[in-house]
Amino acid sequence: VERALLNWETMVGTSDIGIGFPEMYLLDDMNNNLNLYRKKSPITYANNIITPTLIIHSEKDYRCPVEQAEQLFSNLKRRGVDTTMIRFPDESHELSRSGKPNHRIQRFESIIDWHKKQLT
C-alpha cells in the first residue's frame, strides 16, 4: 500500500485537494451522503485484511496525507496482521518519481526485501 487514499471522510479535511476532490469522484457531498463516503472508503473494509501488508508513505504527502496510512497501519497492528510501515521524512506524494535518490533506492529495496521475506 503506497500513498493511498483510504478514508474519504478524513481526506476531505486533510488533503491539499480534499475539499472538492471527493465530490468530483463520488458525485455527492459528504454532508448529504456520509454513508456513501464510508462505503467507498477502503478503511471501512480493513477488518477483512489478513494478508501481510507493507505500507509506504511520505510524511510530507499533502495529496494523500500520512494519516491515511496511519489509520490502516493501526488497524492491522491492533488485529495482529503482519504489517510494516515505512515513513519517508521530507518526501511528498512524488517519492517514487522525484524523491531524493537515496529515498527512492531505500523505497525500492524495502519493497524487494518485503517480498523476499514473504516468499521464503
Name what the model sees in each region.
Residues 1-120:
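Active-site-proximal cap/loop segments of hydrolase catalytic domains
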